[in-house]
Amino acid sequence: VNTTSYQNLTNPQTIYVRLEDLNNDCVSIGEFNLIVSLPPVILQPNEIIALEECDDEIADETTVFDLTVKDDEITLGNVDWEVIYYETEQDALEGTNAIENPESYTNTAVAGNAANPQTLYVAVVNLEGCVAYTTLTIRVLPNPTPSTDAQDIELCDYNNPGDQIEVFDITINEAYIINGELGVSAA
């Protein structure tokens, strides 16, 4: 039997060990089990919805993400598994340089790849220590760029003279404020 490269025949499999004292020929028998555990079943990249956040006040395509909001989706709701995020695939495979604070991660350019969108690498570890890998795309969405210098709207006080209260149609500046952007609305 090759003890450094033994392939189990069943799962689990009991292995018996015989220890023999070479000086006095005394023998002791022990046993242990070989158990093969499956890696966790997790969502794969094409099944995971990208994590998107609006750009912060500065339009620089970087913002802070709480990556942990995706833990439940990735693990299919298994709260006993550990979810670890990495910036590179190599780090994930080696289990090094995990993102220290996944609750407050700012997207960044890594290894020549753009910061937006950014692909993160995810390792999920089950209770047996088996690991499964996937990816998570994070994307910073641009903020609308409205025109902020719309003209004042003036009306004469005809409705109830002297109370200085009138009914305005404030949508008359809407097209100017939207500034031709598609997919936005003014509220």
Locations of the language-model features?
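Extracellular low-complexity Ser/Thr/Asn/Gly-rich intrinsically disordered segments
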Residues: 1-187
